[in-house]
A protein has these predicted regions:
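Transition-metal
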Residues: 1-68, 72, 207-214, 236
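A short glycine-rich, His/Asp/Glu-containing loop-to-beta-strand
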Residues: 85-93
Length: 236
């Protein structure tokens, strides 16, 4: 129900909403100011290249019960692979037809559920070498998770065509790009962290910190807890 969704967004905490648009000046530009009534942005998706993200759905009364049910259902499966679920949350993505989300990576494990419309979700394999060491260090320094696209990456991607009712697991930090089909799209992402991924965060943050002093460390590798412990000691 698009009208109900528009009403829900219009009444929500603006801090939990992020809006981006393609403009002649910049692709995927963050909208610096939200209009007084957000309903028009939802109803006008067809005539724009717009991306609306609702974050922390566990804080939205209309979505929190669904998020809790999904996490309860997937926990027995995912915990055998990623360890205990840490910092779970969820996002709703509402996108204009034809919108292309730039190549990027996310620091979470993710299961994406396609609700309305269609999209092609293309994941790059680890063999592509992304995100690189510099990409990781930049992300943990500034939060910038965008990656440079190179034409040769197109042949390496794994494309998944998603229709309503489909779901897709997106691995931790897997590079991906998304192309929306001919109709507006709604997707739900349920994400979580693991203790290992949080240690990766601290290990990469230590790399970035020492890099400011021209000390270059290799990637954290299989034992990130060593650098994570060092960073936590420095923070005390």
């Amino acid at each position: 129900d698009w009208a109900r969704l528009a009403d829900t967004i219009a009444a929500a905490d603006r801090a939990l909403i992020e809006i981006r648009e393609d403009t002649p000046q910049q692709r995927f530009r963050v909208l610096p100011e939200h209009p007084a009534d957000l309903r028009a942005l939802v109803h006008g998706l067809d005539g724009a290249k717009r991306w609306i993200m609702l974050r922390e759905l566990d804080r939205w009364p209309d979505f929190a019960p669904l998020v809790a049910d999904i996490l309860q259902a997937v926990a027995p499966v995912v915990e055998t692979r990623t360890g205990a679920i840490v910092k779970p949350t969820a996002f709703l993505f509402i996108s204009s037809p034809g919108l292309v989300t730039p190549l990027h990576f996310d620091p979470e494990y993710n299961i994406l559920f396609q609700i309305s419309g269609r999209k092609r979700f293309t994941i790059l394999p680890p063999s592509c070498g992304l995100p690189s060491r510099s990409d990781n260090e930049r992300f943990h320094r500034s939060g910038d998770n965008l990656l440079d696209w190179r034409p040769e990456l197109a042949a390496q991607g794994w494309p998944f065509d998603l229709a309503p009712g489909d779901a897709l697991h997106v691995p931790f930090k897997a590079p991906h790009t998304v192309t929306v089909g001919a109709e507006p799209s709604i997707s739900l992402s349920v994400t979580w962290r693991s203790h290992s991924s949080l240690m990766q965060d601290d290990a990469w943050a230590l790399n970035g910190l020492l890099g400011r002093y021209r000390v270059r460390l290799p990637a954290p590798g299989a034992r990130p807890w060593l650098r994570a412990a060092a960073l936590r000691a420095l923070r005390r």
